[in-house]
């Protein structure tokens, strides 16, 4: 897939995966590493990469399972974000980067939480755009991430709509069904009526993903507990289950505590206290039969969980800033780029000056 102006791409082999990596800026610039979300590739960062201040070198790889990554290399969901983190650290080593700011969108935010816990010494700052909850996606009931069921029912690959999976397999880029990727992005990600100028490129990038029981969304495992599925072994959505995700409180004991910028849209329905795809949200709307009610199966307080962990992080010696972008959906970096870049660039400059370059 061709890149946007100001961005180049090349194929690289690092660690256990061969993948496509996007670059922007001067080769001797301060490196900034980007990670994108579910249903996306590095293409989604191209405008942000190209808009970086001239002293920075933007880097964004396609994650395993997506885009230009080797389709033979799968995600072991039982490691949570572990495979993605290992791939990213291997890329840093290959590029001879000691420390870098990390930028995470959606699932890329979950990768950032894991990096903060296990590789804090590699991070100059953490910059989040609509990040996933540090407790993963669905299956928990309070800000402390308490699982609703012992088997973590309500999280994992069963969250993905089978009709969306069918359209992904068919590579349908249209809007003839409410379950095509374009329809899903318009409803859940962009925030109606917003349609990005390069929507065609973003949809094409999403359709590059590998779909199946060992890829996206992964294997679905039955559970006796409503909504009658639990996390499986493979793929990105199972990897997001709180069963597999790294304990977020591990960041409290990390030897380095990089400053965190958390930017979110005020109208985000993909990551929210009661996200649109949360089984409890769908149950309350009458769209998922058998919902036992909010006492037995409440919606996950994703934003509340993020703030809870970051407040603990601040008490443990870290710092964070929360910025809420008005009239904005799930990806402020894409749909409100001026607002996002203003705070993002300021954070980059202040934290790289304080922490030194690579």
Language model features: what each stretch is:
Residues 1-18:
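N-terminal cap/lid segment of alpha/beta-hydrolase-fold proteins
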Residues 14-15, 60-107, 117-118, 133, ...:
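Active-site loop/oxyanion-hole signature of alpha/beta-hydrolase fold enzymes
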Residues 17-77:
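Conserved HGGG/HGGXW glycine-rich cap/lid loop of the alpha/beta-hydrolase fold
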Residues 26-27, 95-98, 255, 347, ...:
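Glycine-rich phosphate-binding loop signature in dinucleotide/nucleotide-binding domains
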Residues 31, 55-57, 98-101, 122-125, ...:
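Structural signature of beta-strand start/N-cap positions in the alpha/beta core
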Residues 109-120, 126:
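Short glycine-enriched nucleophile-adjacent loop
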Residues 145-305:
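Alpha/beta-hydrolase
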Residues 277-358:
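Catalytic active-site module of serine/aspartate enzymes centered on a nucleophile-bearing elbow/loop
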């Amino acid at each position: 897939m061709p890149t946007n102006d100001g961005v180049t791409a090349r194929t690289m082999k690092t660690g256990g995966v061969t993948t496509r990596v996007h670059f922007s800026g001067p080769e001797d610039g301060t490196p900034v590493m980007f990670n994108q979300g579910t249903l996306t590739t590095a293409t989604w960062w191209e405008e942000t990469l190209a808009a970086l201040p001239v002293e920075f070198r933007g880097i964004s790889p396609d994650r395993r399972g997506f885009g230009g990554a080797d389709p033979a290399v799968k995600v072991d969901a039982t490691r949570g974000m572990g495979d993605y983190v290992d791939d990213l650290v291997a890329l840093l080593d290959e590029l001879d980067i000691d420390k870098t700011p990390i930028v995470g969108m959606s699932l890329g935010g979950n990768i950032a939480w894991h990096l903060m816990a296990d590789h804090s010494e590699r991070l100059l700052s953490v910059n989040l755009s609509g990040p996933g909850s540090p407790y993963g996606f669905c299956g928990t009931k309070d800000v402390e991430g308490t699982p609703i069921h012992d088997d973590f029912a309500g999280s994992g690959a069963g969250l993905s709509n089978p009709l969306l999976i069918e359209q992904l397999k068919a590579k349908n880029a249209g809007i003839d069904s409410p379950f095509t990727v374009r329809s899903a992005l318009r409803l859940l990600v962009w925030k109606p009526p917003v349609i990005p100028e390069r929507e065609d490129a973003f949809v094409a990038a999403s359709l590059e993903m590998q779909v199946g029981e060992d890829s996206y969304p992964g294997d679905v495992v039955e559970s006796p507990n409503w909504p009658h599925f639990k996390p499986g072994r493979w793929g990105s959505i199972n990897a997001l289950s709180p069963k597999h995700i790294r304990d977020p409180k591990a960041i409290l004991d990390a030897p380095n505590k990089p400053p965190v910028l958390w930017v979110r849209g005020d109208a985000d329905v993909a990551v929210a206290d009661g996200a649109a795809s949360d089984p409890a949200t769908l149950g309350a709307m009458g769209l998922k039969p058998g919902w036992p009610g909010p006492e037995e199966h409440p919606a996950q307080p994703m934003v509340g969980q993020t703030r809870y962990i970051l407040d603990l992080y601040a008490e443990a010696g870290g710092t964070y800033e929360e910025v809420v972008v008005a009239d904005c959906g799930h990806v402020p970096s894409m749909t409100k780029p001026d607002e996002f870049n203003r705070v993002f660039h300021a954070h980059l400059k202040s934290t790289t000056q304080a922490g030194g370059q690579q």
